[in-house]
A protein has these predicted regions:
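Membrane-embedded transmembrane alpha-helical bundles that form the catalytic cores
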Residues: 1-448
Length: 449
């Protein structure tokens, strides 16, 4: 209410202060780190712009990137590096044991993209530190994305429109995202936990686990993105879309064009293309792809699981480029789609496991490793209890429900539903609230990144 009551010139200040309070509520120790990051990015951009066409401007740009990455390195990767150095004979360095600041991977990339864009001349340096601070700390997408570039909301930081229509659209998108998280992802999370803890593991229980895990991660992360985009609209911002039904893809290449779009485009524009992209010799192209995907894996987490996860996708993309990509294009959709789903099932098990051996043990369960039975009494019970949810979630992860709904809304009966829709949304909100009150604490999975 304070935001909407504030004069236009003070709206950014109100939003900035509120965003810092929101962040401090969860991470009070790291408000200073965020403020230092904001001031650093703001000052460096001004200096870079003054030296834009000189060598000193390039040097300043690299220094600004190094400063931003140093914060990420210290808080996210220091202990990972120390643990690996400690594997050397006679080395025993103490761990820093620093907790990971929430959202640091997201706002660090936003600051880096901003300073690089200023150096490239793609945007002017922001001269109002409150406006820049609002861009970095904007609370709807601060914690788990999407990764918003300065150029995405540059105009809206200066002047944005507010309307009942835009706010209503934002509320609707927020409630859809909340429902995805609470009513689908959290319940699927219950199934994954049950399958991991069952005393009667079977091949069926492991396949149920794999399917539920992929759908849980999708609805959890896309749900947060929906909530962030919805809140952004309420405050007059148009954030970029972050998902486009990735689970309907028929290749790894297509999947990553549809999944976490803001991260993929960030690595493309600020790492892959500067390295030369695909317009280089084959050896350099292979290097570029593997480097980008190992970095993508490391962005998700400081462990060899994520390095292997990212490198694996890099290898698969190279295989699709040089080996079986054309074959996939000629195959019927169902075959290429099953190929993609099989890869995603295996890769997300690696993504969610704590260690590589643990991931291999879980993947082995899919194929009966350890002489597992095909089914067990417990797995059949779980299938009866959660089978309909798995089917519903699988359908909801495709465009079919939205397409059918849009067609229905064009009919006479659909026009009546327009009047009922607010009641439906309120019902979803109340149901999600009831689930939250009755359930345990279930943070968004991408909070840890």
């Amino acid at each position: 209410m304070c935001y909407f009551a504030a004069p236009r010139k003070l709206k950014n200040a109100v939003l900035f202060v509120f965003s810092l309070i929101f962040y401090g509520w969860g991470e009070p120790r790291y408000i200073v780190l965020m403020i230092v990051s904001i001031v650093s990015g703001f000052v460096f951009a001004l200096m870079i712009e003054k030296k834009q066409n000189k060598k000193s401007g390039l040097i300043l740009m690299w220094i600004s990137v190094a400063v931003s990455l140093s914060f990420l390195l210290i808080f996210k990767y220091a202990d990972f590096l120390i643990e690996n150095v400690n594997q050397l004979p006679g080395v025993s360095l103490p761990l820093s044991k620093l907790s990971l600041p929430i959202g640091i991977s997201f706002y660090t990339f936003q600051i880096i993209s901003y300073t690089v864009d200023v150096w490239r001349g793609d945007t002017k340096a922001q001269r109002n530190i409150i406006s820049f601070g609002t861009y970095v700390s904007l609370f709807p997408q601060l914690i788990a994305g999407p990764i918003v570039r300065y150029t995405d909301i540059e105009r809206e930081l200066q002047e944005r429109k507010h309307s009942v229509t835009l706010a209503a659209s934002g509320i609707k998108r927020f409630l859809i995202g909340l429902s995805k998280k609470v009513l689908i992802a959290n319940v699927l999370g219950e199934l994954t936990d049950i399958c991991l803890k069952t005393s009667q593991p079977s091949i069926l229980s492991w396949w149920m686990y794999a399917a539920a895990l992929v759908l849980q991660i999708y609805f959890d992360f896309s749900g947060y993105s929906d909530m962030a985009i919805g809140l952004g609209r309420i405050f007059g911002f148009q954030f970029p879309e972050n998902f486009n039904y990735p689970l309907i893809s028929r290749s790894v290449k297509e999947f990553w064009r549809r999944w976490h779009i803001s991260l993929g485009s960030w690595f493309r524009d600020y790492v892959y293309i500067p390295l030369g992209g695909s317009r280089v010799k084959t050896g350099l192209y292979v290097r570029n792809v593997i480097a980008v995907w190992m970095l993508t894996g490391l962005w998700h987490g400081a462990s060899w699981n994520f390095v292997l996860w990212g490198a694996g996708f890099g290898v698969l993309l190279l295989c699709e480029r040089f080996l079986w990509g054309k074959w996939l294009e000629r195959m019927p959709y169902i075959i290429s789609h099953l190929y993609l789903l099989f890869i995603i099932l295996l890769s997300f098990i690696l993504f969610s496991a704590d260690t590589i051996p643990q991931a291999m043990q879980r993947i082995g369960g899919l194929f009966g490793a350890g002489k597992l039975p095909v089914i067990s009494v417990q797995s059949v019970y779980y299938l009866r209890s959660y089978g309909l949810l798995l089917i519903f979630a699988a359908i909801a992860a495709t465009p079919l429900p939205v397409t059918a709904f849009n067609r229905f809304m064009k009919t006479k009966a659909g026009s009546i539903l327009n009047w009922v829709m607010p009641i439906v949304l309120v019902g979803l909100f109340l149901l999600a609230t009831a689930f939250l009150v009755d359930g345990s604490y279930n943070p968004f999975l991408y909070f840890r990144f």
